[in-house]
């Protein structure tokens, strides 16, 4: 423990002297109030400290004391359904402790509740040899999450005592005789430094798709479990709603939602909506699998930088249990702005647009902690972390450094488009500029598992949208009447794909989520109509005949999105009606 003195305060940056014994990344208590800070630079005996609380009122001469520990999070039962700030202070218990609606400075509240007793069921016996990552037992944390208690990193040996029963997280539950003869007394909780990635046995290639229930994503731009996706877009294009939708309905075991520097109202929406929503995969409340980290725009800037690492460390902990985890960061741009502010105050050489030169490596450090991997220890298990980051480029300009550095790393780009949002087409993901590098592997996975020709269907649907885009310019110049019958039909089919399939209402109880089976049925109907209508044109029918003769069946296709999942057969039989209607047109008109 080292004690120094403040010599300079510059916003969230404090410089202290007499710190020659300290180390970079040590946590400090700054000033008489004991504010939480982290050493980010050492020069001789002077330490530059990033303070995670409001620094107004601090002055030269006040003491700075190091703890000798890096910024760490507590990992154990009690994480799920909780809301923390960027440095893992529990906001609900913080309010009870301080009797204040705002974050009172210098107050320390344990991250995990020390009073709750959790029922621990041991799965191993005394005398058994264990090593890092081995599962010792489970705690039923919520109806849907079985919290697995693992041997902490660096510990191996023989279990000399373990018992099932009710324990708080700081009571000794098991004892291990280590290889050097010493004894390790273990609790239900462990600590881990947030800036250090948790080790795994081996990395695996992501294959299984993350089903989000959002048609434009699952069909054209899928992300795998263990993949990384970016959602850039201008203000009002719907980044937060896309993030919320994925957080609500993704087929994962755990969701970690990091509100990093965005509006407080958005976190309020999450708190209001999530408890009422039912997870379609488990039938339980969505909050029973969710951890929230709130570091809104009115909280100290420095804590934004920590919040992303806090979230990904929690995600790695659940991944090591063998769970699939999705982490949403809204928004990584605000996190990058926090880096820029600290870099400026440290007087570092600026890079593009004032961001630090190491921006790209910091973004890469975050996204590379996502992935599919085999965990350490026994029994053997696989876990995944899917990282989805919103990016808020000023003015929607995706050529700015944060977006460009993000796109170099992630394999999925859901580009939100202001013109689409202005036309009230939501989700406003532009199908011509977005991409997914997992598309082929996901298509092959689905074709093998579901025994469908999904890959060819989405290729055909995208072809219609691309052809529509090239025809739109002609239509704008000389009108739709100048197009051939085939081209007019192409425009009509593309319109159906856009309006009846890609457009989705996040606030409609049925349309908000679409299962893969329903997506396939809806897209198959549109492509069946395309095949039958093109066939009728070849046999001599006119475009107007086809359109007027299929009004009723096309109306049913348009309403398919509002048909509930338990009435899927009503959607599947539409293809028979399409064939019947086109047959009637051929019998009464054409050649």
UniProtKB/Swiss-Prot annotation:
It is an enzyme of class 7 (translocase). It catalyses: ATP + H2O + 4 H(+)(in) = ADP + phosphate + 5 H(+)(out). One of its GO terms (cellular component) is proton-transporting ATP synthase complex. It comes from Streptococcus pneumoniae (strain Hungary19A-6). The gene is atpA. InterPro entries: ATP-synt_VA_C, ATP-synth_a_Xtn, ATP_synth_asu-like_sf, ATPase_a/bsu_AS, ATPase_F1/V1/A1_a/bsu_N, ATPase_F1/V1/A1_a/bsu_N_sf, ATPase_F1/V1/A1_a/bsu_nucl-bd, ATPase_F1/V1_b/a_C. Keywords: ATP synthesis, ATP-binding, Hydrogen ion transport, Ion transport, Nucleotide-binding, Translocase, Transport. Pfam families: ATP-synt_ab, ATP-synt_ab_N, ATP-synt_ab_Xtn, ATP-synt_VA_C. NCBIfam families: PRK04192.1. Its EC number is 7.1.2.2. The lineage of its organism: Bacteria, Bacillati, Bacillota, Bacilli, Lactobacillales. Produces ATP from ADP in the presence of a proton gradient across the membrane. The V-type alpha chain is a catalytic subunit. The keyword Translocase applies. This is V-type ATP synthase alpha chain. It comes from the Bacteria. Belongs to the ATPase alpha/beta chains family. One of its GO terms (biological process) is proton motive force-driven plasma membrane ATP synthesis. ATP binds at residues 233-240. One of its GO terms (molecular function) is proton-transporting ATPase activity, rotational mechanism.
């Amino acid at each position: 423990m080292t004690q120094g003195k403040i010599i300079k305060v510059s916003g969230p940056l404090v410089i202290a002297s007499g710190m020659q014994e300290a180390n970079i990344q040590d946590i400090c208590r700054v000033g008489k109030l004991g504010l939480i800070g982290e050493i980010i630079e050492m020069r001789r005996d002077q330490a530059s400290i990033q303070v995670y609380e409001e620094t107004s009122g601090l002055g030269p001469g006040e003491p700075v004391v190091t703890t000798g520990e890096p910024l760490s999070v507590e990992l154990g039962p009690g994480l799920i359904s909780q809301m923390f700030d960027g440095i893992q202070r529990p906001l609900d218990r913080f309010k009870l402790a301080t009797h204040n609606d705002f974050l009172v400075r210098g107050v320390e509240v344990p991250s995990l509740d020390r009073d709750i007793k959790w029922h621990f069921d041991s799965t191993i016996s005394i005398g058994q040899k264990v090593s890092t990552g081995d599962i010792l037992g489970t705690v039923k944390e919520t109806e849907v999450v079985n919290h697995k208690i693992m041997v902490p990193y660096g510990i191996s040996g023989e279990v000399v005592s373990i018992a099932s029963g009710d324990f708080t997280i700081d009571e000794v539950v098991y004892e291990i005789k280590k290889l050097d003869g010493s004894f390790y007394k273990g609790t239900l909780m462990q600590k881990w430094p947030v800036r250090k990635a948790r080790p795994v046995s081996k990395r695996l290639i992501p294959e299984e798709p993350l089903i989000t229930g959002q048609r434009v994503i699952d069909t054209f731009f899928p992300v795998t479990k263990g993949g990384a996706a970016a959602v850039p877009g201008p203000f009002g294009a719907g980044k937060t709603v896309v993030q919320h939708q994925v957080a609500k309905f993704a087929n994962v075991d755990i969701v970690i939602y990091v509100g990093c520097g965005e509006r407080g109202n958005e976190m309020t929406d999450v708190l209001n909506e999530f408890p009422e929503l039912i997870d379609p995969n488990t039938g339980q409340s969505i909050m029973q699998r969710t951890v929230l980290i709130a570091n809104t725009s009115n909280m100290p800037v420095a804590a934004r930088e920590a919040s992303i690492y806090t979230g990904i460390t929690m995600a790695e902990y659940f991944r090591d249990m063998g769970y699939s985890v999705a982490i949403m960061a809204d928004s990584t741009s605000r996190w990058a702005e926090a880096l820029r502010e600290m870099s400026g105050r440290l007087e570092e050489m600026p890079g593009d647009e004032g961001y630090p030169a190491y921006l790209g490596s910091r973004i890469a450090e975050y996204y590379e902690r996502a992935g599919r991997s085999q965990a350490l220890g026994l029994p053997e298990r696989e876990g995944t972390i899917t990282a989805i980051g919103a990016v808020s480029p000023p003015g929607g300009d995706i050529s700015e450094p944060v977006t460009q550095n993000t796109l170099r790393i992630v394999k999925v780009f859901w580009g939100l488009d202001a013109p689409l949002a202005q036309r009230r087409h939501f989700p406003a993901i532009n199908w011509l500029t977005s991409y997914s590098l997992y598309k082929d592997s996901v298509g092959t996975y689905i074709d093998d598992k579901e025994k469908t020709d999904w890959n060819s269907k989405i290729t055909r649907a995208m072809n219609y949208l691309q052809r529509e885009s090239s025809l739109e310019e002609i239509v704008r110049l000389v009108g739709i009447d100048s197009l051939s019958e085939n081209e007019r039909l192409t425009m009509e089919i593309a319109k159906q794909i856009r309006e009846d399939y890609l457009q989705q209402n996040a606030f409609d109880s049925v349309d908000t989520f679409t299962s893969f089976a329903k997506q396939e049925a809806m897209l198959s109907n549109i492509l069946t109509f395309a095949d039958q209508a093109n066939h009728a044109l070849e046999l001599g029918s006119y475009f107007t005949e086809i359109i007027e003769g299929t009004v009723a069946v096309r109306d049913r296709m348009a309403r398919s999105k509002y048909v509930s999942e338990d009435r899927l057969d009503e959607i599947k039989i539409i293809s028979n009606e399409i064939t019947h209607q086109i047959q009637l047109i051929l019998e009464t008109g054409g050649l």
